[in-house]
Amino acid sequence: MFGLFGKKPDFMALLQEAKEKKGAVVIDVREPDEYIQGHVPGSINIPTSQINTVNYEKDTPLYLYCLSGGRSKMAMGFLEQKGFQNVKNMGAIGQYRGELEK
């Protein structure tokens, strides 16, 4: 499926890829109040406003998501500018098929 800005990320395929990739980190870039309402199990919360605090090796596989995919796309661009080499935008949490953790 193609959106206004090209192909939409395949959330579930990228989540599976993250689970299979050694050392991968799934990051929910929404605000803490959004995160506690429900998030992908195993994900951590680093809001877009604090993405500059990411303290991983530059080659760590990072998988980002948010409510619509916009904030995660912005965070991905920031991390890439900071030299992170393996960052992927998973897109919107609404594409997640499973039980959310609270």
Which residues does each PLM region occupy?
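Short, surface-exposed ligand- or partner-binding patches at beta-edge/loop junctions that are enriched
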Residues: 65
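Rhodanese-like catalytic fold shared by cysteine-dependent sulfurtransferases
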Residues: 2-25, 31-61, 70-102
